[in-house]
Amino acid sequence: MMLIPTHHFRNIERKPEYLQPEKCVPPPYPGPVGTMWFIRDGCGIACAIVTWFLVLYAEFVVLFVMLIPSRDYVYSIINGIVFNLLAFLALASHCRAMLTDPGAVPKGNATKEFIESLQLKPGQVVYKCPKCCSIKPDRAHHCSVCKRCIRKMDHHCPWVNNCVGENNQKYFVLFTMYIALISLHALIMVGFHFLHCFEEDWTKCSSFSPPTTVILLILLCFEGLLFLIFTSVMFGTQVHSICTDETGIEQLKKEERRWAKKTKWMNMKAVFGHPFSLGWASPFATPDQGKADPYQYVV
């Protein structure tokens, strides 16, 4: 008697009723091309608003408390241009990280027709998520906030109200880098401004009253120090994750490595684009994946 080749399914909840592909409905209509990705999560939206508010607060203090009242016009112009450029790039990176599809797996694609179209060999394993009824590529994980399986998911970040995954990791790294830079720049300017005010008359070093000036500068100093530490750690963690080609979830779960090992430089190019260029530092340049290997549906 001839045996019919079968394929093995694995799901994250071990529920037998989910193992039948017929249980899944056809995937919904994906919508028009270019539809904006946005997660409707109250906590994430609030965190994103707070992020913008803190950056704009820093802009206000830097411009109206320190730079505009300064008599050194060259100092004010140079630092104003640098700080505003970094702040603009930080907010642009935040928008791209928040509004870019991080790599969502098509929802409801675990249908009999789709599974047959994969042309799987006998004995091959496919991963199926019962929560969104999707066939998951290798290294994809389900996000309970986004309610989707995300390819190469690192973590869900409420500050960008999105998952950090295959398609938006570059923008998240740039966001942490530029926030760290403007925090460091703001702290340096606060230090110089305090020295200037101690040497001169406090009533002449700011257009605000001395008590108001001190309060605004102390708040900015606290904000800058907090964000400098936080984003520097996140930036270093992300760069290390990229170089080792191991996401935060994979490190946490200590998952077995089933993908080909590549050099650190190739891993960097896979995230930031091929080849190396100034576009790596631009949130407006979409990474060109070049010859980067796609993450397959089977292992």
UniProtKB/Swiss-Prot annotation:
Tissue expression per record: Widely expressed with significant expression in heart, lung, liver, skeletal muscle, kidney, testis, thymus, small intestine and leukocyte.
Catalytic activity: L-cysteinyl-[protein] + hexadecanoyl-CoA = S-hexadecanoyl-L-cysteinyl-[protein] + CoA; L-cysteinyl-[protein] + tetradecanoyl-CoA = S-tetradecanoyl-L-cysteinyl-[protein] + CoA; L-cysteinyl-[protein] + octadecanoyl-CoA = S-octadecanoyl-L-cysteinyl-[protein] + CoA
Location within or outside the cell: Golgi apparatus membrane
Residue span, DHHC domain: 127-177
Active site: C157 (s-palmitoyl cysteine intermediate)
Transmembrane segments: 48-68, 73-93, 172-192, 215-235
Top EC category: transferase
Topological category with respect to the lipid bilayer: Multi-pass membrane protein
Extracellular-facing ranges: 69-72, 193-214
GO-annotated molecular function: palmitoyltransferase activity; protein homodimerization activity; protein-cysteine S-myristoyltransferase activity; protein-cysteine S-palmitoyltransferase activity; protein-cysteine S-stearoyltransferase activity
One CC-aspect GO term: Golgi membrane
This enzyme's EC code(s): 2.3.1.225, 2.3.1.-
Membrane-side (Cytoplasmic) residue stretches: 1-47, 94-171, 236-299
Positions carrying Phosphotyrosine: Y18
UniProt keyword Acyltransferase, yes or no: yes
Domains: entry comment: The DHHC domain is required for palmitoyltransferase activity.
Subunit structure: Monomer. Homooligomers. The monomeric form has a higher catalytic activity. Forms heterooligomers with ZDHHC7. Interacts with TNFRSF10A.
UniProt-listed PANTHER family: PALMITOYLTRANSFERASE ZDHHC16 (PTHR12246)
Physiological role: Golgi-localized palmitoyltransferase that catalyzes the addition of palmitate onto various protein substrates. Has no stringent fatty acid selectivity and in addition to palmitate can also transfer onto target proteins myristate from tetradecanoyl-CoA and stearate from octadecanoyl-CoA. Plays an important role in G protein-coupled receptor signaling pathways involving GNAQ and potentially other heterotrimeric G proteins by regulating their dynamic association with the plasma membrane.
Protein name per Swiss-Prot or TrEMBL: Palmitoyltransferase ZDHHC3
Species assigned in the record: Homo sapiens (Human)
